[in-house]
Amino acid sequence: VGFGLLAQPSITQVLTWFHSLLFQWQWELFLTDPFIFLFWIFIILTTFVWGRGLFCGWMCPFGSLSELIYKVAGAIGLKRFQFALPMKWHNRLKWIKYFVFFALLAVSVFSMGLAEILAEVEPFKTTFLVGMFNRAWPYTLFVAVLLGLSIFIERPFCKYLCPLGASLAMPSTFRWFGLKRKQECNSCKACAVGCGSLAIDEHGRIDHRECMHCLDCMILYTDEHACPPLAQERKRRTKAGLPLTPIGADGYYIPIKPVPAAKA
């Protein structure tokens, strides 16, 4: 999608729509690239259904490139250098992307041209549309720094700087579907340990505005060895000689039905 179709959605498109709504709507602005237009319809619909995670976590070209670098770096022996920021710092830095988004939105009201220049805070144009080696060195250096940070921190741009992610995070509050949770999730917090998005807080709550839908927590949700409530129930049943029934949609073992007494 990024390198092949050059179809990386951008905050510039969001600003263009906002500017057109305020001043003069022109369909030509949105139909010059039909694939991008259809892609945006898909993004908007899925954001209100599942939140930003489907696009940001699974379809964003730059986010995918950043995650690929992080995973490859871990696989070739650099995992010991990889780290996640402490939650207190993450909770402060995550607001930067919202500041960037609203700043660009405000500037676009007065000067769309200036807003497009400032939107270079997104590395998408340099990475996919023009190419890192076809631009002035400051742009190339900026992208190189972001991709270099991706070796050590999972998706740093997505979590802390991306104005497009911020614009999709806000409507994610009104999504129709969320991730499944157990009663014990508020106190257990085992999923938070492996959450690359740092979207699970100290109370076990998922912030769907930050969630990238990696689904690691959903894998743990039904893992009878790794999910603490399931592991405890598995050990209890094994010790008591009780059968291990399948795990239901609620994330718990299906209750054992008593066997009716045989008729005399």
Indicate where each model-derived feature is located.
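Non-ligating segments of multi-cofactor redox enzymes
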Residues: 1-194, 198-202, 209, 216-264
